[in-house]
């Protein structure tokens, strides 16, 4: 079974107003997004995001675990962990590890003089300054024309369109949300944000017409 990640932070390349948890300390604020992940109508795992903001500095950590079974036999497994540091809206560093059906991927990168240096399974290369990953949690990432895939280290050209204001079901609630469509090579997904700009939901089209969905934990 082949799945293309909505996470692009993964297949989750990949992939909240009502469930955004916000706590403030003396110097830092922490936000969390906790999603259940569904393949069509079947729950297959989770993807959690934790953000710590301290002035202009931001640290984001994510973890995803997915498993697809047929007759209780695992046919697909996925684990993704990623830590990113940001400063003034620019990616400063990334360190990720992914196990997709036993295939291991590592991505490490740091901002440096002349660009952003990335090391992946395929080697080392330099990207432009002030790049972004598929940072769904920050709607500003939609301004970029290319995004770093945190699973593979690929720098992916994307096309992003604003669809409009739509009603979104979130658990037992119906919310007014802004919908966007993001497309790239082997990638098609939709994102929803609240009126205040908080990330609410994600849906990704997979091979064979199946849908991968992120549903916020209530």
Pin down the residues of each PLM region.
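Residue-level detector of intrinsically disordered, flexible termini
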Residues: 5-6, 18, 27-28
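Bacterial N-terminal signal peptides
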Residues: 13-23
């Amino acid at each position: 079974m082949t799945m293309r990640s909505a996470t692009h932070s993964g297949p989750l390349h990949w992939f909240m107003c009502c469930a955004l948890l916000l706590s403030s300390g003396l110097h830092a604020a922490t936000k969390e997004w906790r999603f259940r992940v569904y393949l069509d109508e079947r729950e297959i795992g989770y993807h959690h995001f934790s953000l710590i903001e301290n002035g202009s500095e931001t640290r984001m950590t994510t973890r995803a675990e997915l498993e697809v079974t047929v007759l209780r036999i695992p046919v697909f497994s996925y684990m993704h962990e990623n830590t990113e540091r940001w400063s003034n809206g620019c990616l400063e560093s990334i360190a990720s590890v992914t196990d997709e059906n036993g295939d291991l991927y590592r991505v490490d990168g740091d901002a440096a003089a002349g660009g952003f240096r990335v090391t992946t399974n395929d080697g080392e290369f330099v990207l432009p300054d002030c790049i972004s990953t598929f940072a769904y949690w920050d709607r500003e990432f939609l301004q970029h024309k290319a995004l770093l895939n945190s699973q593979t280290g690929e720098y992916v050209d994307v096309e992003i369109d604003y669809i409009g204001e739509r009603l979104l079901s979130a658990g037992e609630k119906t919310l007014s949300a802004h919908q966007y469509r993001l497309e790239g090579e082997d990638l098609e997904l939709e994102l929803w944000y609240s009126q205040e700009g908080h990330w609410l939901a994600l849906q990704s089209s997979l091979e064979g017409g199946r849908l991968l969905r992120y549903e916020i934990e209530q």
